[in-house]
């Protein structure tokens, strides 16, 4: 059982009651995996971003040049790939593949999605490379929370 909840009216991650009255802080693991895709060079570029995606909007097509992890703080996001869609809601933590063309879409009509991203890329590469829109049509399955 998780120690957080998602408010259905705002689709926002709510942390409540995590820190006991006699304690100073609590750590909660949201994602813990062995990662083989991290750069092995002596240096890596690390970037932490807060991103927002407005209701009904779609990000541009792009690829990641290194590993990226996202924590979705508010709203819903659908990732569109050539062969599949992936759907996430507030409270989810996920990673996106390296070098695979995709885009993020916020299918909610009213709530902006808010995410924190943690990026690790080889020092000589940009985190993201924008790409020309592909000629194929992405799989666009509806987000389960809207359907």
Residue map of PLM features:
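Extracytoplasmic low-complexity repetitive segments enriched in small/polar residues
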Residues: 36, 93, 115, 119, ...
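Short acidic-glycine-tyrosine-enriched beta hairpin
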Residues: 53, 82-101
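A short, N-terminal "cap"/entry segment at the start of jelly-roll beta-barrel domains
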Residues: 1-45, 131-147
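Ligand-binding loop in jelly-roll beta-barrel domains
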Residues: 78, 98-126
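Glycine- and acidic-residue-biased ligand/ion/polar-headgroup-sensing regions
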Residues: 65-83, 92
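A short beta-loop-beta micro-motif enriched in histidine and acidic residues
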Residues: 43-44, 55-69
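Conserved hydrophobic/aromatic beta-strand scaffold that supports enzyme active sites
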Residues: 48-52, 69, 93-95, 117
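Extracellular/periplasmic catalytic domains that process cell-envelope and extracellular macromolecules
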Residues: 40-41, 63, 71, 107-112
């Amino acid at each position: 059982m998780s120690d957080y909840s998602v408010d259905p009216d705002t689709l926002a991650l709510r942390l409540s009651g995590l820190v006991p009255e006699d304690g100073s802080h609590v750590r909660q693991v949201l994602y813990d995996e062995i990662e083989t895709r991290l750069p092995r060079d002596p240096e890596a570029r690390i970037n932490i971003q807060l991103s927002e995606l407005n209701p009904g909007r779609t990000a541009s097509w792009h690829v990641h040049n290194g590993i990226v992890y996202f924590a979705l703080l508010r709203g819903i996001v659908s990732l569109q790939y050539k062969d599949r869609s992936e759907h996430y809601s507030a409270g989810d933590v996920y990673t996106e593949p390296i070098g695979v063309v995709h885009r993020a879409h916020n299918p909610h009509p009213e709530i902006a999605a808010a995410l924190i991203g943690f990026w690790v890329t080889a020092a000589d590469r940009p985190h993201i490379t924008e790409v020309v829109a592909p000629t194929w049509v992405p799989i666009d399955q509806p987000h389960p929370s809207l359907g």
